[in-house]
Amino acid sequence: KADAVFAFQLR
């Protein structure tokens, strides 16, 4: 999953 990348880009 890309939840970490999502949160990182959703900063």
From Swiss-Prot:
Claim: Zinc-finger is one of the keywords in the record: no
GO molecular-function terms, A-Z: ATP binding; sulfate adenylyltransferase (ATP) activity
Enzyme Commission designation: 2.7.7.4
Catalytic activity: sulfate + ATP + H(+) = adenosine 5'-phosphosulfate + diphosphate
Keywords from the named record: ATP-binding, Nucleotide-binding, Nucleotidyltransferase, Transferase
Lineage: superkingdom: Eukaryota
Enzyme class: transferase
The family this protein is said to belong to: Belongs to the sulfate adenylyltransferase family.
UniProt-recorded name of the protein: Sulfate adenylyltransferase
Organism: Populus euphratica
